[in-house]
């Protein structure tokens, strides 16, 4: 008795592309499963595109996977996962068919971007120290290369040659790109994430998410409280086998920025969450994510235990002693709703009655080490996140205190 895959070999070919890859030499590569028939190298096929049009193309190269590597083959049969090159504008969800039997499969819908950030050339005083790729040309080429395979991402050039607008499916989507780039040696800075708003029937609408959460029963209250403060609406609740509670929320996309780290903390790592785009709805109003100001560095230098000791009563610190800092860099969160400028590089003046090692006796409160996602949520519109292979630094857009005050005066 033949299996269904074996019997499909004798039918007309049909390949559904579910992923993309890219090679600098051969260009874009479509990855998909041969649903039926057999595909051969150099044979003509018809590509059924997502907009309903058809394009006659040829299989210039055909690959299959062996472990993690691609191996070139002459043919593949139904059931095989193949990689096909020679189609320059192929996209996910499109179908390759035999010219004699054009039957496209149902298209896979790709969610549109909901959140955008600006990627900029790093212009801080420490620019170029830690990164290998630092110029606007390097950053531009890397971002547009990402779009070749990451179909949910959009990259646009702006009026400034040093700034690129990158739109993605959410905070996690963009943070993965940022982390990947810094591991590859790129150095740049990013702005605060913003949701992509739309005008629908004369109303300003924002993207919504269906958030599905499973947590142990003892953490349900904390999760509902946090999501409620982020404009989340509980639409379904149930119990799973084993004592887990199933929760479903409808929540604005901006309400989930920075929440994943909070969720893991609130559930002690025992919770599971997943989100799906759920359309656009009228703007839900302001979501308060940070009511406090920033602790900003007064001058360039190295942080000292004495300087941090005199600053720690003003709020929460993000760095230890012995870290290089520059004017305008953010090193903590102020306890009040205002920015304060502190000199954390200040050291004791040595006298006959003060030993040089007296700083060691100062007792510092443990500092908070911020993750990438926490940094992305923390920054305000007048702040930036500096990303390098070795460091994540928060900073003001305008580094000079005098220039910031002039800007505030002009704004008033």
Model-derived segments and spans:
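Single conserved hydrophobic/aromatic residue that forms the stacking wall/gate
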Residues: 1-6, 10
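Solvent-exposed alpha-helical segments within well-ordered globular domains of core cellular machineries
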Residues: 15-19, 33, 40-47, 57-64, ...
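Conserved nucleotide-binding/hydrolysis modules and their immediate coupling elements
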Residues: 16-117, 127-129, 163, 292, ...
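Short beta-strands and strand-coil junctions in structured, solvent-facing domains, enriched
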Residues: 23, 65-71, 90-92, 104-105, ...
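Long insertion/accessory domains within large nucleic-acid-processing enzymes
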Residues: 65-73, 205, 251, 262-380, ...
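Short, hydrophobic beta-strand segments
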Residues: 113-129, 160-167, 200-214, 240-254, ...
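A short, contiguous, amphipathic alpha-helix enriched in charged residues
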Residues: 124-147, 365
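Conserved structured catalytic cores and adjacent interaction surfaces
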Residues: 151-225, 229-233, 239-246, 250-252, ...
């Amino acid at each position: 008795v033949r299996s269904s895959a074996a019997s499909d070999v004798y039918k007309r070919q049909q390949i559904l592309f579910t992923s993309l890859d890219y090679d600098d030499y051969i260009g874009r590569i479509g990855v998909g499963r041969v649903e039926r028939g057999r595909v051969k190298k150099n044979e003509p096929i018809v590509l059924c595109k997502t907009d309903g049009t058809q394009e006659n193309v040829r299989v210039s190269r055909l690959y299959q996977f062996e472990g993690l590597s691609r191996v070139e083959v002459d043919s593949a049969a139904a059931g095989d996962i193949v990689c096909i090159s020679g189609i320059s504008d192929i996209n996910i969800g499109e179908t390759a068919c035999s010219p004699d039997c054009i039957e496209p499969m149902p298209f896979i819908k790709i969610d549109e971007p909901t959140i955008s950030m600006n990627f900029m050339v790093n212009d801080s005083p420490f620019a170029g120290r830690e990164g290998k790729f630092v110029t606007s040309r390097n950053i531009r080429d890397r971002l547009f290369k990402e779009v070749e395979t990451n179909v949910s991402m959009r990259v646009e050039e702006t009026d400034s040659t040093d700034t690129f607008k990158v739109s993605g499916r959410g905070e996690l989507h963009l943070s993965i790109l940022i982390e990947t780039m810094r591991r590859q040696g790129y150095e740049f800075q990013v702005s605060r994430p913003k949701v992509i708003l739309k005008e629908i029937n004369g109303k300003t609408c924002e993207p919504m998410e269906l958030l599905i959460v499973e947590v142990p029963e003892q953490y349900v209250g904390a999760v509902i409280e946090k999501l409620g403060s982020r404009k989340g609406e509980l639409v379904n609740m149930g119990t799973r086998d084993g004592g887990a509670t199933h929760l479903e929320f409808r929540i604005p996309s901006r309400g989930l920025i920075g929440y994943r780290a909070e969720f893991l903390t609130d559930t002690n790592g025992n919770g599971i969450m997943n989100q799906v785009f759920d359309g656009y709805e009228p703007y839900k109003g302001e979501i308060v994510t940070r009511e406090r100001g920033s602790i900003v560095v007064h001058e360039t230098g190295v942080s000292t235990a004495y300087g941090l000791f005199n600053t720690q009563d003003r709020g929460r610190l993000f760095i230890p002693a012995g870290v290089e800092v520059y004017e305008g860099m953010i090193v903590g969160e102020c306890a009040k709703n205002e920015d304060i400028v502190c000199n954390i590089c200040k050291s004791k003046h040595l006298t006959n009655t003060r030993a040089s090692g007296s700083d060691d006796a100062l007792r510092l409160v443990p500092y908070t080490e911020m993750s990438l996602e926490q940094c992305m949520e923390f920054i305000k519109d007048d702040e930036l996140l500096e990303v390098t292979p070795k460091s994540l630094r928060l900073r003001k857009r305008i580094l000079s205190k005098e220039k910031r005050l002039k800007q505030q005066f002009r704004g008033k």
